[in-house]
């Protein structure tokens, strides 16, 4: 109640089901910890509410060594299917908040794909930074995985989306992932890292990975390579390169060179925000003039609301959400084996 008062939030509930009983609410957003995603989504769908779902759609939430990765795959896909079935059963729309899909640089890539008519042969994508500060992210029990799931869901979702888009544009059928190979590691737990002060990287990981790499093979034989790590200094990296049969497109969501600034002392910039997760404001920086817009946050909200209003599916919805979970947990199987 104190939080609600501070931010002028008119209604407070201690049970989400009470909120879902309200007849004046048509659409709910679920910005909650990953372990609550699928249960809240099913409850919302059963209440007839349309849903905006944070990434990833769901996962398997257990101690990292309690189950085999195959068992985790089965649990995660079961949870995902429960959400899909609830949405279909209740005829509600789920907007999957994969902002890479809506980022203006990726939207431009789609238009360039349309113009060129080329085939996507090789996709290379990354999201990396110096580590999450959210305590729940450090345990498999609450997060469902480490960097491969928590951050990898962004670039993996993006490359899946682009191949879906290509297939639908050319043949009317999305091109799906056929297989995946992957590796993961806990690089901040290495002996050399343990001995090294100061720690510029987050090191409080318990049983989740802080480094991951995956190679996806699609049904048409084309490839995507995805990196997701918590061992990358210098701010958030949201990058994608598309190698087409007749062109190359480099997408820089973060960092990008729309604004470049230099200061010998970080204090010169005072409290002015530069960009997310930089360890210092000194030296050359890449201040984003409108970080939310460049990452696609307003655009995804607009599409989700319009989809509900118009009774259509959003650009990023259940098919992408479901396949992303399937691919990531298949990647965990590969990494274990």
Region annotations inferred by a language model:
Residues 1-7:
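N-terminal Rossmann-like dinucleotide-binding module
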Residues 9-16:
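Conserved SAM-binding strand-loop segment of SAM-dependent methyltransferases
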Residues 13, 53-54, 94-96, 226, ...:
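Hydrophobic residues in well-ordered beta-strands that form the structural core
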Residues 26-27, 38-99:
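Beta-strand-loop-alpha-helix segment that lines the small-molecule cofactor/substrate pocket
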Residues 27-29, 69, 89, 290, ...:
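C-terminal helix-rich "cap/oligomerization" subdomain common to oxidoreductases
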Residues 31-35:
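N-terminal glycine-rich "phosphate-gripper" loop used for MgATP/nucleotide binding
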Residues 89-93, 100-205:
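Predominantly a Rossmann-like dinucleotide-binding segment in NAD(P)-dependent oxidoreductases
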Residues 157-263, 298-310, 329-331:
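Contiguous beta-strand/loop segments that form the cofactor/metal-binding neighborhood of enzyme cores
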């Amino acid at each position: 109640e104190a939080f609600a008062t501070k931010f002028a939030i008119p209604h407070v509930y201690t049970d989400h089901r009470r909120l879902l009983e309200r007849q004046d609410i048509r659409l709910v957003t679920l910005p909650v910890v990953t372990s609550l995603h699928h249960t809240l989504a099913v409850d919302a769908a059963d209440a007839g509410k349309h849903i905006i779902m944070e990434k990833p759609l769901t996962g398997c939430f257990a101690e990292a060594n309690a189950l085999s990765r195959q068992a985790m795959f089965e649990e995660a896909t079961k949870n995902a299917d429960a959400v899909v079935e609830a949405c279909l059963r209740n005829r509600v729309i789920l907007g999957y908040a994969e902002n890479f899909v809506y980022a203006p640089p990726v939207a431009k890539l789609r238009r360039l794909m349309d113009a060129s008519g080329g085939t996507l042969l090789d996709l290379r994508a990354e999201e990396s930074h110096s580590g999450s500060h959210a305590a729940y992210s450090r345990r498999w029990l609450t997060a469902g995985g480490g960097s491969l799931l928590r951050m990898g869901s962004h670039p993996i979702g993006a490359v899946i989306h682009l191949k879906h888009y290509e297939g639908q544009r050319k043949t009317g059928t999305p091109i799906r992932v056929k297989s995946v190979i992957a590796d993961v590691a806990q690089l901040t737990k290495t002996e050399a890292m343990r001995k090294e002060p100061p720690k510029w990287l987050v090191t409080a990981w318990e049983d989740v990975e802080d480094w991951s790499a995956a190679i996806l093979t699609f049904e048409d034989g084309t490839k995507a390579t995805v990196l997701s790590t918590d061992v990358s200094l210098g701010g958030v990296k949201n990058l994608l390169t598309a190698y087409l049969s007749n062109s190359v497109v480099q997408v820089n969501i973060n960092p990008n060179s729309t604004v470049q600034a230099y200061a010998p002392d970080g204090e010169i910039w005072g409290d002015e925000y530069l960009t997310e997760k930089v360890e210092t404001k000194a030296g050359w920086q890449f201040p984003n003039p409108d970080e939310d817009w460049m990452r696609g946050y307003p655009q995804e909200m607009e599409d989700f609301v319009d989809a509900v209003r118009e009774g259509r599916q959003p650009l990023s919805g259940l098919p992408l959400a479901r396949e992303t979970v399937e691919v990531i947990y298949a990647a965990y199987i590969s990494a274990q084996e």
